A protein has these predicted regions:
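Amphipathic terminal alpha-helices
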Residues: 277, 289-295, 299, 303-327
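Mid/C-terminal beta-alpha module of Rossmann-like enzyme folds, strongest
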Residues: 200, 223-282, 325-327
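Active-site Tyr-X1-5-Lys
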Residues: 130, 145-171
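NAD(P)H-binding glycine-rich loop region in Rossmannoid oxidoreductase-like domains
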Residues: 58-96
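Conserved Rossmann-fold NAD(P)-dependent oxidoreductase catalytic core, especially the SDR/UDP-sugar
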Residues: 102-146
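Glycine-rich Rossmann NAD(P)(H)-binding loop
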Residues: 179-182, 208-218, 231, 240-252
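N-terminal Rossmann NAD(P)H-binding glycine-rich loop of SDR-like oxidoreductase domains
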Residues: 1-26
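NAD(P)-dependent short-chain dehydrogenase/reductase
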Residues: 160-215, 221-226
Length: 327
């Protein structure tokens, strides 16, 4: 099996790649080749099969055709400009998140010869906009309030239509906000959800730009990888024509996050959080969904690695900090 990962240098892309390289299999099939793409070269990888490293912008004309020329069996489309950056740079957001996605799907469509890969597309809960019900189900209509959400919503429609026409076997998964993200902060407007936990655990002070009553939907990197692997191997006939699914997660307020941090790591760690409201971030967060009913995804076999927000913090300490944090 040949696997292509677009956006392989990003956090979720790296985690997915590490898991695939470690397992050497996807479902019941041995991996025989992997292609890892990003705008910057993903890290070189050692494996018992060829691993091609490709650096380049997949939204440049002709680039996607090169990526699918060898007909990968599974395509993980993780490449995207994140929410805050897409809002600040309108042209860049649409070029990457919309035009790039269309170019990739068209490259697959035009490959011909009966080529029909499984395409796993990472969408976002940002496709939904206020006003919200208490818990948002898959049937809730798309009214995104950000450019990023609009781009992802259009990507969902394209994926469903190209699948309906028989050009690919697509599954779109709406990821919760991933928490706790390892590494340095990125330009995602949601980054503070991870920052206020990751930085204090590393002994650093951090700014909280919103109020503690802000509620949001979260899942760990470990769960995100599990979602992607299940989407790539599940029986897609059970999904039917509604090809995009909201992934399960945990709904929690910022205050509940901080309370969990205190329980797991102590008051001294939580005291490193400094409250400094940011009107730009607050304006974006006001239009975000807060809670979901992921019943359909659960019925189709998607599961999370965490059951409580304490678990989210413990998983980060275990996976990223070697089991230790700065008290």
């Amino acid at each position: 099996m040949h696997i292509l990962v677009l956006g392989a240098a990003g956090m979720v892309g790296r985690k997915l790649t590490e898991r695939l390289l470690r397992d050497g299999r996807l479902g019941n099939s041995d991996i025989t080749r992997m292609t890892l793409q990003d705008v910057v070269a993903p890290a070189a990888a050692k494996a018992g099969f060829p691993v091609d490293i490709v650096a380049g912008d997949f939204a440049v004309a002709g680039f996607a055709e090169k990526l699918v020329a060898d007909r990968p069996d599974v395509v993980f489309h993780l490449a995207a400009i994140v929410s805050g950056e897409a809002e600040l740079d309108f042209d860049k957001g649409y070029r990457i998140n919309l035009d790039g996605t269309r170019m990739l799907l068209d490259a697959i469509r035009l490959a011909g010869g009966g080529y029909k890969p499984r395409v796993v597309f990472t969408s976002s809960i940002a496709v939904f906009g206020a006003p919200f019900p208490d818990a948002i189900g898959d049937e809730f209509f798309h009214t995104p309030l950000l450019s990023y959400g609009t781009q992802k919503a259009i990507g969902e429609l394209l994926l469903a239509d190209y699948t309906r026409r028989g050009f690919m076997d697509g599954i779109g998964i709406r990821l919760p906000t991933i928490c706790i993200r390892p590494g340095l902060p990125n330009k995602a407007a949601s980054g503070f959800f991870s920052n206020i936990l990751r930085e204090p655990l590393a002994g650093k002070e951090v700014v909280l730009p919103v109020s503690e009553d802000v509620r949001h939907w979260h899942a760990t990197p470990r769960s995100a990888v599990g979602f992607l692997l299940h989407a790539a191997t599940m029986d897609s006939t059970a999904v039917g024509p509604r090809r995009n699914l909201t992934m399960p997660g945990l709904s929690a307020t910022v205050g509940e996050q901080i309370a969990a941090l205190k329980r797991v790591a102590g008051d001294t760690v939580a005291a490193r959080i400094k409250r400094e409201p940011d009107p730009f971030i607050m304006g974006i967060v006001d239009g975000w969904p807060r809670n979901f009913d992921a019943k359909r995804a659960l019925q189709l076999g998607f599961t999370t690695a965490e059951k409580t927000f304490d678990d989210i913090i413990r998983i980060h300490i275990e996976d990223e900090l070697g089991g230790k944090f700065v008290a």
